[in-house]
Structures are given as C-alpha cells and as structure tokens.
C-alpha cells in the first residue's frame, strides 16, 4: 500500500542556507526588537527590526557607507567600520525612542572579537541596552584600528585618530 514519500522537503530559505529557523523562532518570540548585523563583501549593515505577521519592520538602519559623511576614511568592511556603524545605529535608535534590543547575527559564525561583535560594542558604548557577555567583544585597540595602523603605517597610519574623530562626530548627532 502506498504511504507517500519518506523524505521531508525543507523550507526554501533553509535549503538556500539563508535562514536558521530554530534561531529565528527564539529571536522573534522575544519581547525586545532585534539588532540585526549583517556583513557583505564591502559594507556592514545594522538594523533595528521587529517581527510582525505581515513581515518584519525595520525601524532604524545604518550602513557603513554612511560613515564617509562623518569623516571616516578607512575601509568600510573592517572592525573599526563595524564598531562605528553599530555606534551610528545606536545613536539613531536612541533618538527614535528605542532603548534596547537583542543581537541577531544570523548565520555568521559567533567567533569572539568578530566584526558583528564590534558593531555590538559600538552600540553598547553609545548607550544602547543589549544583553551580551564582555568576553566576546573585540579589544579596544582593534575597534580603534591600531592593529591596522601597525600593520600598514604608510596607508593607515592616521586611522586611530580618524576613528576617534568619527566617534566624536557620531556622538554629536545624539545631542
């Protein structure tokens, strides 16, 4: 007698490797909004998102390409850029009335000191409330770009000063 197929076809986004539904379910049922951090080959993208039945809603967003407006001259995909993008997102979220969120790194590997955690550190230092463990955050030297300036002084010798000036410009937006 026929019983049908003995296999199960996974959801399309799971088959494509784009969504971890187990992790998404845990994040969606939380009462706080999510701070979503995604890295591309050229940029870091941070968003504050809430889940609704019609679809997720983005309340605040920041892209590392916007750092040029604040005087940042370094790469838009490194650890200092992630730190500054997280800080920019937090400043915008605080101005919009958001006070906290839960970190959502998607399918990115949770390696201590990774760029997604640099964005978290920037948001926390700007005054945004996100639960986290201090051990996963990158060192201050990495967020300021001192490791890049040490490695390539001819190209990025002034990066720590540039990051500090950009932090001042971003925090000036809060006032």
UniProtKB/Swiss-Prot annotation:
One example GO MF annotation: structural constituent of ribosome
GO biological process: ribosomal large subunit assembly; translation
A GO-annotated cellular component: cytosolic large ribosomal subunit
Alphabetized UniProt keyword annotations: Ribonucleoprotein, Ribosomal protein, RNA-binding, rRNA-binding
Domain of life per record: Archaea
Pfam families referenced in this protein's UniProt entry, alphabetically: Ribosomal_L5e
Gene3D superfamilies: 3.30.420.100
Covalent S-S links between cysteines: none
The UniProt record lists the keyword Ribosomal protein: yes
CDD domains membership: Ribosomal_L18_L5e
InterPro entries: Rbsml_uL18_euk
HAMAP family: Ribosomal_uL18_A
PANTHER family found in the cross-reference section: LARGE RIBOSOMAL SUBUNIT PROTEIN UL18, RIBOSOMAL PROTEIN L5-RELATED
Family recorded in the similarity comment: Belongs to the universal ribosomal protein uL18 family.
Alphabetical list of NCBIfam families matching this protein: PRK08569.1
Self-association state and partner proteins as the record states: Part of the 50S ribosomal subunit. Contacts the 5S and 23S rRNAs.
Task performed by this protein: This is one of the proteins that bind and probably mediate the attachment of the 5S RNA into the large ribosomal subunit, where it forms part of the central protuberance.
Record protein name field: Large ribosomal subunit protein uL18
Organism: Methanospirillum hungatei JF-1 (strain ATCC 27890 / DSM 864 / NBRC 100397 / JF-1)
